[in-house]
Design a protein with these regions (language model features):
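Short beta->alpha transition motifs characteristic of CBS
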Residues: 5, 104, 111, 123-128
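N-terminal beta-strand motif that seeds the catalytic metal site of vicinal oxygen chelate
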Residues: 1-16, 69, 126-128
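Long, continuous compositionally biased terminal/linker segments
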Residues: 40-81
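Core segments of cupin and vicinal oxygen chelate
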Residues: 8-52
């Protein structure tokens, strides 16, 4: 349904570093970066796979309140690795890796708050 999403961040360099480290276990890379010189105002970093940016961060005034994004993980080990990497990168725990049977029997997710307080999740829907 969605092609890509983007959010403004309060500290572009800090957030770019956070997402680079947090996304590595999920196989997501920085696939495109656009400088403020190119846009005439804000820097943007696009993360995704196979050269296709699907999640963007941009320098600017953060939105009021937080948002929640769930990123697909290939397996439960990747969810665990995302959680550890995101915490090491400066994220804050918002729910450790584990089953969330109130969603469905195989819902395995982990939640971390990014540097701006957004709820970032890695999720796997496959059985163990």
């Amino acid at each position: 349904m969605l092609d890509h999403v983007g959010i403004p961040v309060s500290d572009y360099t800090r957030s770019k570093g956070f997402y680079l480290r947090a996304f590595a276990p999920l196989g997501y890379d920085l696939v495109l970066e656009v400088s403020s010189k190119e846009t005439g105002g804000h820097s943007h970093a696009g993360f995704g796979t196979k050269g296709r940016p699907q999640f963007w961060i941009g320098s600017g005034k953060p939105i009021i309140g937080s948002v929640h994004f769930a990123f697909m993980a290939k397996d439960r080990t990747a969810v665990d690795a995302f959680y550890a990497a995101a915490l090491k990168a400066g994220g804050k725990d918002n729910g450790p890796p584990g089953l969330r049977p109130h969603y469905h029997a195989n819902y395995y997710g982990a939640f971390v708050l990014d540097p701006d307080g957004h709820n970032i999740e890695a999720v796997c829907h496959l059985p163990a």
